[in-house]
Swiss-Prot record:
Single GO MF annotation: DNA binding
Gene Ontology biological process terms, A to Z: DNA recombination; DNA repair
Compartmental location: Cytoplasm
Stated role: The RuvA-RuvB-RuvC complex processes Holliday junction (HJ) DNA during genetic recombination and DNA repair. Endonuclease that resolves HJ intermediates. Cleaves cruciform DNA by making single-stranded nicks across the HJ at symmetrical positions within the homologous arms, yielding a 5'-phosphate and a 3'-hydroxyl group; requires a central core of homology in the junction. The consensus cleavage sequence is 5'-(A/T)TT(C/G)-3'. Cleavage occurs on the 3'-side of the TT dinucleotide at the point of strand exchange.
Record's cofactor remark: Binds 2 Mg(2+) ion per subunit.
Name of the featured protein: Crossover junction endodeoxyribonuclease RuvC
Length: 173
């Protein structure tokens, strides 16, 4: 059993989603958005760090998963996104959490079955997969998608590691 904190970073709105993974079962624990109010970027980064730290304290996750930076057309936006990610990652590292990063296309693939899915499709599938009564906010749904992606990727890696161990045992008898 592990608790996974997923983060969809943004310099103005950072989504978060927390799930519990028990084998193949995923249970929704919480989600929402950290909305920054500061006008200047350093103040927003401080709010992101404080918000993620508070979420870590509240939910006590075992692992931290975050969306990777994608190359945006606007370099300034990409830099701000990278700084927002950094603030969230520092909060995780300060809490001694392992950090895992996933590309947006991989996250969408894990949740919807296609890497080109839009936000509405992600919201719908997250609601369905976690049996939520209503669609989560877009940024929170994306963050839950990050957590779901980690859970699915982690299950696959554990299964592959087990098969590799079994194969090695059989080979050296």
């Amino acid at each position: 059993m592990s608790i996974i904190l997923g983060i969809d970073p943004g310099s103005r709105i950072t989504g978060y989603g927390v799930i519990r993974q028990q084998g193949r079962h995923l249970q929704y624990l919480g989600s929402g958005c950290i909305r920054t109010s500061e006008k200047e970027l350093p103040g927003r980064l401080k709010q992101i760090y404080a918000g993620v730290t508070e979420i870590i304290t509240q939910f006590q996750p075992d692992v931290f998963a975050i969306e990777q930076v994608f190359m945006a057309k606007n370099a300034d936006s990409a830099l701000k996104l990278g700084q927002a990610r950094g603030s969230a990652i520092v909060a995780a590292v300060n809490a001694d959490l392992p950090v895992h990063e996933y590309a947006a296309r991989l996250i969408k693939q894990a949740v919807t079955g296609t890497g080109g899915a839009d936000k509405v499709q992600v919201q719908h599938m997250v609601q369905h997969m976690l049996k939520l009564p209503a669609k989560p906010q877009a940024d929170a749904a994306d963050a839950l998608g990050v957590a779901i992606c980690h859970a699915n990727t982690n299950k696959t890696l554990v299964a592959l590691a087990g098969k590799a161990t079994s194969a090695r045992k059989g080979r050296y008898r």
